[in-house]
Curated annotation (Swiss-Prot):
Residues where carbamoyl phosphate binds: R56, T57, R106, H139, Q142, G268, P269
Pfam families, sorted: OTCace (PF00185), OTCace_N (PF02729)
Species whose genome carries this gene: Ligilactobacillus salivarius (strain UCC118)
Gene Ontology CC entries for this record: cytosol
Protein name according to UniProt: Aspartate carbamoyltransferase catalytic subunit
UniProt binding sites for L-aspartate: K84, R172, R224
Biological process annotations from GO: 'de novo' pyrimidine nucleobase biosynthetic process; 'de novo' UMP biosynthetic process; amino acid metabolic process
GO molecular function: amino acid binding; aspartate carbamoyltransferase activity
Upper classification of the organism: Bacteria, Bacillati, Bacillota, Bacilli, Lactobacillales
Catalytic activity: carbamoyl phosphate + L-aspartate = N-carbamoyl-L-aspartate + phosphate + H(+)
The family this protein is said to belong to: Belongs to the aspartate/ornithine carbamoyltransferase superfamily. ATCase family.
Length: 316
């Protein structure tokens, strides 16, 4: 049996080796195909701290945790001492002192995790951190389930043409995927409103209008328009939902131009009739539901890797 991946924390895809990615895909596929969860000889406690709204990621992580046999400790940010001014570090210090071994965290602050894993000798926080999404920075679990879904379809990444479409500058999904896909050999393109494109993307791919790209793409990755991150953005008012769909959305005309084996992806939640025509969300080329299903198994693989890295539950 191949040696399984061990990590101390899982906060970004940037520090994963290609071999690590392969191990995670293989392990997630093992779980998806009915493989048994590892036996734990000691109880492992996990808390999910979601400071931003979430359905898919939160529920998917909890499902993964329960399938692995972990004990989930409820945590509601709205009724926690965070509302009294307690810092994230002190919240985790408290949970750790009470016996929590792992925390999955979704937070609005970019790179929030750096102050939790880069500790000085006087700090006593000892807890595995899994990033459930940080601001517009990274979304490693979404990226990994996307990578798994693409691998299931094509068996490789080399030479694939992938276009990421939409609210690029506000998207942690775009950042994680562009970093990993290019490293794995895919050719990445960007599309959508030009004022949501940033020069930081230049080293990962090129921008072009969607209608110039659509026929040649293997993967079309649609992004949600993130209205909650547009506070003060005058450009958002330049178009209505109908106009956005006409200019940048996946409608029937664009769908019919796709290659025979092309797939469409979306991290969710979908704004139906905006990024994606309502009647096409579950069309044959759509992998939206598959992504959500794969998310549970990939998150099982990610959690298990951190458990092994920290020797939790007797795993090594």
């Amino acid at each position: 049996m191949d040696k399984l991946l061990s990590l101390n924390n899982f906060v970004s895809v940037e520090n994963l080796e290609n071999e690590d990615v392969e191990k995670l895909i293989k392990r997630a596929e093992y779980f998806k195909n009915g493989g048994e969860a590892p036996h734990l000889n000691k109880e492992v406690y996990v808390a999910n701290l979601f400071f931003e709204n979430s359905t898919r990621t939160h529920t998917s992580f909890e499902m993964a945790e329960r399938k692995l046999g972990l004990t989930v400790i409820p945590f509601d940010p709205g009724h926690s001492s965070v509302n009294k001014g307690e810092t994230l570090y002190d919240t985790l210090l408290t949970l750790g002192a009470l016996g929590v071994d792992l925390s999955v965290i979704r937070h609005s602050e970019n790179n929030y995790y750096e102050k939790l894993i880069n500790l000085n000798p006087d700090q006593h926080l000892n807890m595995g951190i899994i990033n459930g999404g940080d601001g517009s920075g990274q979304h490693p679990s979404q990226c990994m389930l996307d990578i798994m879904t693409i691998h299931e379809q094509f068996g490789t990444f080399k030479g694939l043409k992938v276009v990421i479409v939409g609210d690029l500058k506000n998207s942690r999904v775009a950042r994680s995927n562009m970093q990993l896909l290019t490293r794995l050999g895919a050719k990445v393109y960007f599309s959508g409103p030009e004022y949501w494109y940033s020069s930081e993307f230049d080293k990962y791919g090129e921008y072009a209008p969607l209608d110039e790209l659509i026929e040649d793409m293997d993967v079309v990755m649609l992004l949600r328009v993130q209205h909650e991150r547009h506070d003060g953005d005058k450009n958002e008012k330049l178009f209505s939902e109908t106009e956005y769909h006409k200019l940048y959305g996946l409608d029937e005309k664009r769908y019919n131009k796709l290659k025979k084996d092309a797939i469409i992806m979306h991290p969710g939640p979908v704004n139906r009739g905006v990024e994606w025509a309502d009647e096409l969300v579950e069309a044959p080329k759509s992998r939206y539901v598959t992504q959500m299903k794969n998310g549970v198994f990939m998150r099982m693989a990610m959690i298990e890797a951190v458990m092994r890295g920290r020797k939790l539950g007797g795993l090594e």
